[in-house]
Amino acid sequence: MVLIDFRYLFNVEYALTPKDEYPDYETYETDLFSKLLNRFVSIANEYYSSYGKCVLAIDDHTKRYWRKAFYPLYKINRLNLFSLDDKKNNISDEIEQAWLKIIPILRNTKIVPLEISGAEGDDLIAVLAKSPERHLIVSVDKDFIQLLDENIDILSPKTGEITRAEDINGSISAIMDDHILNGDASDGIPSIYAYRKPSDSFSLWFKKKFKTKLTEDVYFRLMTQTPEAELLYKSDILNEYRDNIGFYNDSETFFSTILERELSVKRIPLSYKIERNVKNSVENGFDRSKIFAKDKFLSYNYRRNQRLIDLRYVDTNIVKRVISAFETYRREYGDIKAFCSKYQIPISEIK
């Protein structure tokens, strides 16, 4: 089975197709989707003989992923917290809405479009790759390295190179463990060593905000049950900064620009203390289980990251629905001549 990471290819073609180079929006949209669809068709045809049918793994377009329900700060770092100009995002949303109208048409082709409520494309690929046949994952996402085995290969659409399990230096399980320990900054997943103890800045903020002392037990409950407190902390500090430098409502846009350039989130006082000795003891320790048994924060943080990063821990409800959707999928056979003509797809190659 050829398993295409839709989101990556979509983002690449979107970035390489600047709207301002087209005379009108309709021409722009048509050309963007023409390039995208022809790329899918090319991949499906090139690797069919070796890997079989092609599945397009599509993220839930509402972005209500199960990981966000499990950990509210998941991918929160991808939001623009400062910009007041949403024009660029609206263009993207417009394109995404247009794409949703194409998915039903693809059901009349050899490509299987699959989208499951609450799931990301990674989840779909991880679940379908468990079936006992050869698989080719089409993506540059390094998270898929954990899935490599004798039946699963990875094709980089960027370089055209195929990676197999034997090409990986070192143990895949060791690479996975290191990933869990250190988190994934691109997805907003912190290392297991973060948020063990509050910084002085966070403790003072909490006491001022809630008129009570931040005890060890309260901090543990806060970080494990309502991690969104991190955003509240940052928001209050940013607002205090703005008030202190005397910006007014009519200077919002100017302030936003200054803030984005001069006061990055990285410069906000951390909400937790950095403890390098803890990291050294975990990564160099002979019996990690004993260390975790004595430290409830490390234990919780490790299990949290394992659930978010390790694709063996995809939500069980998602797993069932992916399998059901794939097994009950039925291709349709409507007329797609107009569709192929519009997007310049040879009909013989997509049917």
Task: Go through each PLM region and give its residues.
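Helix-hairpin-helix
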Residues: 144-145, 170-300, 309, 315
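Short, surface-exposed amphipathic charged segments that create phosphate/polyanion-binding patches used
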Residues: 128-132, 166-176
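Residues within well-ordered alpha-helical secondary structure of globular protein domains
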Residues: 131, 150, 225, 260-263, ...
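Glycine-centered flexibility motif
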Residues: 35, 160, 183, 225-226, ...
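Noncatalytic, basic helical substrate-engagement surface that gates or grips nucleic-acid strands
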Residues: 1-138, 144-163, 310-311, 316-328
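Charged/polar, solvent-exposed surface patches and flexible loops
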Residues: 12, 38, 42, 46, ...
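Low-complexity, acidic/Ser/Thr- and charged residue-rich accessory regions of DNA metabolism proteins
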Residues: 18, 32, 297-302, 307, ...
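Assembly/interface hotspot detector across virion components, adhesins/toxins, and nucleic-acid enzymes
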Residues: 155-157, 162-165, 178-182, 194
